Swiss-Prot record:
<keyword id="KW-0347">Helicase</keyword>
<feature type="binding site">
    <location>
        <begin position="142"/>
        <end position="149"/>
    </location>
    <ligand>
        <name>ATP</name>
    </ligand>
</feature>
<comment type="subunit">
    <text>Interacts with the SSU processome.</text>
</comment>
<feature type="short sequence motif" description="Q motif">
    <location>
        <begin position="98"/>
        <end position="126"/>
    </location>
</feature>
<comment type="similarity">
    <text>Belongs to the DEAD box helicase family. DDX47/RRP3 subfamily.</text>
</comment>
<keyword id="KW-0378">Hydrolase</keyword>
<dbReference type="InterPro" id="IPR050079">
    <property type="entry name" value="DEAD_box_RNA_helicase"/>
</dbReference>
<feature type="compositionally biased region" description="Low complexity">
    <location>
        <begin position="34"/>
        <end position="62"/>
    </location>
</feature>
<feature type="compositionally biased region" description="Basic and acidic residues">
    <location>
        <begin position="68"/>
        <end position="79"/>
    </location>
</feature>
<dbReference type="GO" id="GO:0005829">
    <property type="term" value="C:cytosol"/>
</dbReference>
<feature type="region of interest" description="Disordered">
    <location>
        <begin position="34"/>
        <end position="99"/>
    </location>
</feature>
<dbReference type="GO" id="GO:0003724">
    <property type="term" value="F:RNA helicase activity"/>
</dbReference>
<feature type="domain" description="Helicase C-terminal">
    <location>
        <begin position="327"/>
        <end position="471"/>
    </location>
</feature>
<dbReference type="GO" id="GO:0016887">
    <property type="term" value="F:ATP hydrolysis activity"/>
</dbReference>
<keyword id="KW-0067">ATP-binding</keyword>
<feature type="short sequence motif" description="DEAD box">
    <location>
        <begin position="248"/>
        <end position="251"/>
    </location>
</feature>
<dbReference type="Pfam" id="PF00271">
    <property type="entry name" value="Helicase_C"/>
</dbReference>
């Protein structure tokens, strides 16, 4: 090896050592930061009429699989021991609900529940439905897959049966996929009741959706942005007589910058007559603000003990931003026969990584929130059919029917909750799986929070330095080409937009 090559190798090793030292130094600092953050969030909490907290270590069941496969839920869940505490510090156990028949539901709704093989209510359903049937506002803190969709759909359908009217209920969801899943749940549960529902999401025809709205559906499931489009432009459409409002996965809606859109929607819905359900996986200051739109809500919290799959091997790879893409290719090359999901933080990173991989000859597809619905479904179907690599934003981290995955790569480091959702895409159903996280000096705080949550230090992935240096030139070339392709695409879009403006 030449003297220049030795110098390069020495510098890279030194940089890795320095990065490892930084991680050690910031560990104590990060623990203090986590404690301070926890204390601050406690101070921000608003009073509620009652709080019910249920601890469970069960693995949640996907709402979609519950409907599409009609599996017997009793084989998937055992209700854990529960405890509840009210705002006056008294405590009692919530009633043990063994069957949906105990809710005194109308026969038509019970018939649908039984046909779906729903037997014993999940913890969130057992805790929330009785209060919802009494007409109380609900704040539900539970993960996707806990059965929360049925927890708010069943009370709405119960009251709708006795007082049916158009535009009776509105469900706001952060993504198109979740909106479709919620509609499936409502349609299945309301199949014996003549329910009319409509899904109002971006990427679909505004005109067709306007026609659907004019048919006076009972339940509207919508993403916030597209709903505002119809409130502003669809004649005769109004939410002034709305009886129920559901804000599902509010934490994700805030992450997707829908806070202002939700505020705008709330201003158009009479607060004095509506019942509101707010569901979220986490609680934050922003979500506390939305709680103010509820009337003395009952707060139901399912405290799930977050954990990664038992047969998951987790490692981390220390890298610099300049060598991050080369390290990614090294990892993908470890076993080209594996099914891989590469998670990124942004749409730009997803597109750039996918193009780079394609330029290097890999077969892959991308998945992100800016794709039309047809393309998103197409990407998932290609991955299911055998395309080995899926590059995706966190739209693929939860709530989607993604097949068995061998390897998850965290190209960008997420927060601890999203990390658990991401790596949970592998090592499923008792199978082994692996997750590797690429960590730069800019990711230290986020990475340490993950280790804190896991309660363990992740071992380093041993990737040969010589191999990385051998790949660097070809990866840099493929990356430059990908960046240029994105620039050309952006310029073409600008020209098309300018042409449309000139033709008006």
């Amino acid at each position: 090896m030449s003297s220049k090559g030795i110098q390069k190798k020495t510098k890279a090793v030194d940089a890795t050592k320095k990065l490892a030292e930084k991680i050690k130094k910031q560990a104590l600092k990060q623990k203090a930061l986590a404690s301070a953050s926890s204390a601050a969030s406690t101070k921000e909490s608003l009073p509620v009429s009652e709080t019910i907290s249920i601890s469970t270590s069960e693995t949640p069941v996907s709402d979609v699989s519950e409907l599409s496969n009609k599996e017997d839920l009793s084989t998937k869940k055992d209700q854990s021991s529960a405890s509840s505490s009210s705002s006056t510090s008294s405590s009692s156990s919530p009633p043990s609900v063994q069957s949906f028949t105990e809710f005194d539901l109308v026969p038509e709704l019970l018939e649908s529940i039984q046909s779906l093989k729903y037997t014993q209510p999940t913890p969130i359903q057992a805790a929330a439905i009785p209060h919802a049937l009494q007409g109380k506002d609900i704040v539900g803190i539970a993960e996707t897959g806990s059965g929360k969709t049925a927890a708010f759909a069943i009370p709405i359908l119960q009251t709708l049966y006795t007082a049916a009217q158009p535009y009776y209920a509105l469900v706001l969801a952060p993504t198109r996929e979740l909106a479709f899943q919620i509609k499936e749940t409502f349609d299945a549960l309301g199949s014996s009741m003549g329910l009319r529902s409509v899904c109002i999401i971006g990427g679909m025809s505004m005109m067709e959706q306007a026609r659907d709205l004019m048919r006076k559906p009972h339940v509207i499931i919508a993403t916030p942005g597209r709903l505002i489009d119809h409130l502003e432009h669809t004649k005769g459409f109004s939410l002034k007589k709305l009886q129920y409002l559901v804000m599902d996965e509010v934490d994700r809606m805030i992450d997707l910058d829908y806070a202002k859109a939700i505020d705008q929607i709330l201003k158009q819905i009479p607060s004095h007559q509506r019942i509101t359900y707010l569901y979220t996986a986490t609680m934050s200051r922003e979500i506390e603000k939305f709680k103010r739109s509820l009337n003395s809500p009952v707060q139901v919290e399912i405290v799930k003990l977050e954990k990664v799959p038992d047969k998951l091997k987790q490692t981390m790879c220390l890298t610099s931003p300049n060598t991050k893409d080369t390290r990614l290719i090294q990892i993908v090359n470890l076993d080209s026969m594996k099914r891989v999901i590469i998670f990124t933080r942004t749409v730009v990173h997803t597109r750039r990584c996918c193009l780079m991989l394609l330029n290097l000859g890999f077969k892959c597809v991308e998945l992100h929130g800016q794709m039309p619905q047809s393309r998103r479904l197409g990407a998932i179907n290609k991955f299911k059919a055998g395309t080995p690599i899926l590059v995706a934003t966190d739209v693929a981290a939860r709530g989607l029917d993604i097949p068995a995955v061998d390897l998850v790569i965290n190209y960008d480091i997420p927060d601890p909750t999203l990390y658990i959702h991401r790596v949970g895409r592998t090592a499923r159903a008792g199978k082994a799986g692996k997750a590797i996280s690429l960590v730069t000096q800019y990711d230290l705080e986020s990475y340490l929070r993950i280790e804190n949550t896991l309660g363990t230090k992740l071992p380093k992935e041993d990737l040969p330095l010589d191999e990385m240096q051998g790949l660097q030139v070809s990866v840099d070339r493929a990356l430059s080409k990908a960046i240029q392709m994105l620039r050309n695409e952006e310029n073409d879009n600008k020209l098309r937009h300018r042409g449309r403006s000139n033709n008006k």
